[in-house]
Amino acid sequence: NKLDYTRKDSPIHSNSGYKYKKTNTKIYDLKYSIDNQEPDITMVCWGGMVCDMELLINDLTEKEEIVVEMICPTMLYPLNIQPIVESILKTKKLLIVEDDNPFGTLGSEIIAQLKCLNIEFNAIKLNTADDIIPSSRILEEKHYVTNQEVYNTAKEFFLK
């Protein structure tokens, strides 16, 4: 949801010290990170996923001591890959969380662009189920990536 991007000045309270920063570009991207702390994992997400991931990242840091740097592109095309590159060079681990089926997505494009730059990294891409979005609430919950799935994946990814 594009309205989520306007709340960058009022993020949730973070006991871990996470803050939003804007990139220095005309149409800026957001970076959610802790100042003076090297991240363990780079997470990329956008839209309606951002607020949920903000809460989840704080939990990962407070409960598991995993520091995540979240990059939130605001303009998907043309994509400004530079903030992602800068983060990946530090972490070597990319976790993409997207509300889309797994084939031909922005997450796939991000991975392809990074590989074309010959950057060495490991990547995990979490997507919705590869099916039609159901109208039933119960089936819809099985369709989308859950916060618990993202949490568990990030925790396992950190240990690799």
Positions of PLM-derived features:
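Thiamine diphosphate
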Residues: 1-160
